[in-house]
Amino acid sequence: VEYPDEVPTRYDRTIYDVGRIPDGGQSGVGKFHYPLTVDGYRVVYKGYLADPDLQDARARWPFVAIWDNHEFSWQGRQSIVQAGGAPQPGQTVKVAANQAWFEYIPARVKAPSGSLDTFGALAVKNVPIEKWDDGGLGIEPNNLKAINSLIAYRSLRYGRHLDLILTDQHSFCGADPTDAEGVAKIYDPSFNGMFSERAMIALDAGRTFNGGKPPAELTFG
């Protein structure tokens, strides 16, 4: 969230005061404020849900919702908070984000309480994640508990001809390869997120690349 007294406009558009985040953090890039508690996430949801056009749309049409990155943390993944700076353990933040999403987004997903009405308390600690499985998932218990506090990926069937599959691209995501030291060997920063096909195949396969014998080093160009 940007505050109009700090950033009056962005892309020639007026910044409105949708709310002030209590006990939040500030991005290492620009003057973005982001929530770290359930009260902070509630401020964000209340702010954007005050939009009369969105209210009218919600009243008229059904929505099928799944979260993206900003429902938790801009550059975050699993229960790791990252917003223009170094990654930090954020298991309590992930649970808070999941709780607020559950409270404000219409979706039939099961919370820790086992109910569709209340989220339920879930105690976790912000602990560094030091061990990972072969797919890049941190196996630290608080990380797994935070991630699984709310599972939003699901499938819906409409009639005989439509199966709608909603995927979660962030809760189980591995490390961003563009953050790695020496990444310039396989990555051109002037083309953000663009890898050569050979590098992309190797990155997707991970430890299983080349029959389980990936090269010690990849080069680009």
Residue ranges and their predicted role:
Residues V1-G221:
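Metal-dependent phosphoester/phosphodiester hydrolase catalytic core
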